[in-house]
Amino acid sequence: MAIATIDPTTGITLKTFDAHTPEEVENRIARAEAAFRSLQNTSFEERARWMHKAADILESEADEVARLIATEMGKTLTTAKYEALKSATGMRHFADHAQRYLSPETPVPASEVNASNLHVQFDPLGVVLAVMPWNYPLWQAVRFAAPALMAGNTGLLKHASNVPQCALYLGDLFARGGFPEGAFQTLLVEGKDVIPLVDDARIRAVTLTGSVAAGSAIAEAAGRNIKRSVLELGGMDVFIVMPSADIEKAAAQAVIARLQNSGQSCIAAKRFYVHEDVYDRFEHLFVTGMAEAVAGDPLDESTSFGPLATERGRQDVHELVRDAREKGAAVQCGGEIPEGEGWYYPATVLTGVTEDMRIYREECFGPVACLYKVSSLQEAIALSNDSDFGLSSSVWTNDETEATEAARSIEAGGVFINGLTASFPAVPFGGLKDSGYGRELSAYGIREFVNIKTVWTS
């Protein structure tokens, strides 16, 4: 089977790669296992030196890498370069802080547990498999790779099949930085080949960012093998606007929140709950901003957002919009597939969305916003929590009591007050319910793939 780069602006295949044979996959697993025996005995200082060098290389090649990302999956050149530089920043963060995150700890004085010496240490697990998506082809993989490698693990990356060049670039990047041969490798395989990898005893843990269906399959396989796993799945993130908020700022940020990455982000806001006292004003500003956003060539600096990454993805988005329209939702802007080549979809705002519509509960991975009127913060929170997902949320209020209540009551992995949901290297990222389990980034993320070992001395 060939794995291809297809230009989402034209649908034309740009480059193809042969999928790895079973023998090639076996060789890569064996190399990863052999590399672990070496890497686990290196010092934090050595690994940090290699990681910083890899970050140096990435920064020096940021323009080239941005063009690669934009060409493979369609995000604008500006956001692609930002992703490349953010990835380098994440690499430097773990190079600088991994030793602190994983330094031995003494939970209580040794005498309290009848010991002369007591400490807890954090040992690497071994080979870790990462199954990563196409929407942030560099950042998603780096936020796994950087902490895993700095902890002393080795990594195998099974990337999405439509971003093979990004995957291969990452496979080379860490080797160019100085990490031992086999420490981080890319597997060009199909999705059906993932479960046998999870079943392989040499792979000690697995992390996946992707759909609920894919996460469920990984969780089942990992559970069957009593194997560590971390899942970052879908999101139905909310954007709540209360009367005390700066409405002009909130509306402008709401456009960004929905259109980031052409709406193809788990943490892109999808449900907008606006208090009735400011609803009309917000709706006018928001719909105007969405309607003015330009979908176009990601390499053109005037473009607001690019095409969707796949033809199937665009069709899925349009089917959700069509279902809502047929059941009575009003389309305030957008809502139609444009003529011409490329997998473009316009910025779309729906009102009058009801529970019988698929988009009410299903994640829409594209530039479509559902706008709702609420009478109180409590109603907004109740609606927010009435979802199978719980990844993150954004709440706009200048009332401290409201902010505190939202932070306490919203069922999500994150609550952002007067700001957009984002991921930062130093801050844990993840969700609950169907949005997954475990955490990425920060001290919490790096500790997902270590053995927490108690050392007690009589």
Swiss-Prot record:
InterPro entries for this protein: Ald_DH/histidinol_DH, Ald_DH_C, Ald_DH_CS_CYS, Ald_DH_CS_GLU, Ald_DH_N, AldDh_AldH, Aldehyde_DH_dom, ALDH_GabD1-like
Record protein name field: Aldehyde dehydrogenase
Transmembrane feature ranges: none
Annotated NADP(+) binding sites: W134, N135, K158, H159, A160, S161, G210, S211, L233, E363
A GO term for molecular function: NADP binding
EC number: 1.2.1.3, 1.2.1.4
CDD domains (alphabetical): ALDH_SSADH1_GabD1 (cd07100)
Gene induction: Is induced by D-xylose. No significant levels of expression can detected when the cells are grown on various other sugars such as L-xylose, L-arabinose, D-galactose, D-tagatose and D-glucose.
Keywords: Carbohydrate metabolism, NAD, NADP, Oxidoreductase, Plasmid
Pfam families: Aldedh
Gene: aldh
PANTHER family assigned to the protein according to its UniProt record, in alphabetical order: SUCCINATE SEMIALDEHYDE DEHYDROGENASE [NAD(P)+] SAD
Pathway linked to the protein: Carbohydrate metabolism; D-xylose degradation
Protein family (similarity comment): Belongs to the aldehyde dehydrogenase family.
Function: Aldehyde dehydrogenase able to oxidize various aldehydes such as formaldehyde, glyceraldehyde, butyraldehyde, glutaraldehyde and benzaldehyde (in vitro). Is likely involved in the oxidative D-xylose degradation pathway, catalyzing the oxidation step of 2-oxoglutarate semialdehyde to 2-oxoglutarate. Is able to use both NAD(+) and NADP(+); however, shows a preference for NADP(+). Does not display succinate semialdehyde dehydrogenase activity.
GO term, biological process aspect, one: D-xylose catabolic process
Active site as annotated: E232, C266
Oligomer status and interactors: Monomer.
Reaction(s) catalysed (UniProt annotation): an aldehyde + NAD(+) + H2O = a carboxylate + NADH + 2 H(+); an aldehyde + NADP(+) + H2O = a carboxylate + NADPH + 2 H(+)
